[in-house]
Amino acid sequence: MTVIDNHEALAKEGDNGLSEAGARDYFELLKPRVMSLVVFTAFAGLVLAPGHINPVLGLIAILCIAVGAGASGALNMWYDADIDAIMTRTAKRPIPAGRVAPSEALAFGLVLSGFSVTILGLAVNWLSAAILAFTIFFYAVVYTMWLKRSTPQNIVIGGAAGAFPPVIGWACVTGNVTIESVVLFLIIFLWTPAHFWALALFKMGDYEAVGVPMLPNVAGVPTTKNQIVAYAVLTAIIGVVPSFMGFASLGYGVVATVLGVIFVHCSISVWRMPDGDVKMVPAKKLFAFSIFYLFAIFSALLIDRLVAVLMSGGVGGWL
């Protein structure tokens, strides 16, 4: 079945009326694994920002950011249902599996988008709400509907959507965007290509089948390997910048350096993969470590902040 045929089949399926979707199916539309990373980095931005926020408002902010991220995930699944049905990695998602009708997923995503942005604006501030609205739009429209199927630089440019959560968290506390929040943005933005291109290497067949122009399919594996190393190096460099800005301690800088060296080492292992390697073990290891790297970097920033607060004689600066 081609992408066009599958799109038409899904459209007809959506015209048959409401599905019998359960709460779990709608939860899957939110892309919970992606949401967990969004929530964590947003929380980091909120905690690391100078100043204080009422804990209740902080909780509302995190919930709104989580719901907004889930909403963009639902809109992404709605639009990509045709190719999701063909790719082995995504074929069991709620829409291609027939558990949720496309129209329901669209309505679900739109309602959650409006709800999350409105509540964040009313409860916290409108700058953070505006950035959240832009993030949802960028991911659902700019990336999903345009970049993903039109350019091999899709995840480079589209990666900005995943990099905004710490900026939103920061804006919730400060009401503005500063250079420190931009650094948090850049850590995720520069990390994204190596992370997703590692996945694209061992999922080339899937992307080829649906015509998504991922870099390995368009520019070839050697070029992709070079780009992965380049972005891994950039990620390692930006990862230590907070310690040089006085935004984090030397201890954090040491941890970030070690993590960065391992990240680059994993990328070099991918670069050294022989041509025609079917198993792509180094690429799979890089993909797995990249997830750990991002969680570890932001965890290190949070721990560094907590230690600084405790050493200053209290926990009042934690939130």
From Swiss-Prot:
<dbReference type="InterPro" id="IPR006369">
    <property type="entry name" value="Protohaem_IX_farnesylTrfase"/>
</dbReference>
<protein>
    <recommendedName>
        <fullName>Protoheme IX farnesyltransferase</fullName>
        <ecNumber>2.5.1.141</ecNumber>
    </recommendedName>
</protein>
<feature type="transmembrane region" description="Helical">
    <location>
        <begin position="155"/>
        <end position="175"/>
    </location>
</feature>
<dbReference type="GO" id="GO:0005886">
    <property type="term" value="C:plasma membrane"/>
</dbReference>
<feature type="transmembrane region" description="Helical">
    <location>
        <begin position="221"/>
        <end position="241"/>
    </location>
</feature>
<keyword id="KW-0997">Cell inner membrane</keyword>
<dbReference type="InterPro" id="IPR044878">
    <property type="entry name" value="UbiA_sf"/>
</dbReference>
<dbReference type="InterPro" id="IPR030470">
    <property type="entry name" value="UbiA_prenylTrfase_CS"/>
</dbReference>
<comment type="pathway">
    <text>Porphyrin-containing compound metabolism; heme O biosynthesis; heme O from protoheme: step 1/1.</text>
</comment>
<keyword id="KW-0350">Heme biosynthesis</keyword>
<keyword id="KW-1133">Transmembrane helix</keyword>
<keyword id="KW-0472">Membrane</keyword>
<dbReference type="GO" id="GO:0008495">
    <property type="term" value="F:protoheme IX farnesyltransferase activity"/>
</dbReference>
<comment type="similarity">
    <text>Belongs to the UbiA prenyltransferase family. Protoheme IX farnesyltransferase subfamily.</text>
</comment>
<keyword id="KW-0812">Transmembrane</keyword>
<dbReference type="InterPro" id="IPR000537">
    <property type="entry name" value="UbiA_prenyltransferase"/>
</dbReference>
<dbReference type="Pfam" id="PF01040">
    <property type="entry name" value="UbiA"/>
</dbReference>
<feature type="transmembrane region" description="Helical">
    <location>
        <begin position="95"/>
        <end position="115"/>
    </location>
</feature>
<feature type="transmembrane region" description="Helical">
    <location>
        <begin position="182"/>
        <end position="202"/>
    </location>
</feature>
<comment type="function">
    <text>Converts heme B (protoheme IX) to heme O by substitution of the vinyl group on carbon 2 of heme B porphyrin ring with a hydroxyethyl farnesyl side group.</text>
</comment>
<keyword id="KW-1003">Cell membrane</keyword>
<dbReference type="GO" id="GO:0048034">
    <property type="term" value="P:heme O biosynthetic process"/>
</dbReference>
<feature type="transmembrane region" description="Helical">
    <location>
        <begin position="244"/>
        <end position="264"/>
    </location>
</feature>
<feature type="transmembrane region" description="Helical">
    <location>
        <begin position="119"/>
        <end position="139"/>
    </location>
</feature>
<feature type="transmembrane region" description="Helical">
    <location>
        <begin position="55"/>
        <end position="75"/>
    </location>
</feature>
<feature type="transmembrane region" description="Helical">
    <location>
        <begin position="291"/>
        <end position="311"/>
    </location>
</feature>
<feature type="transmembrane region" description="Helical">
    <location>
        <begin position="34"/>
        <end position="54"/>
    </location>
</feature>
<keyword id="KW-0808">Transferase</keyword>
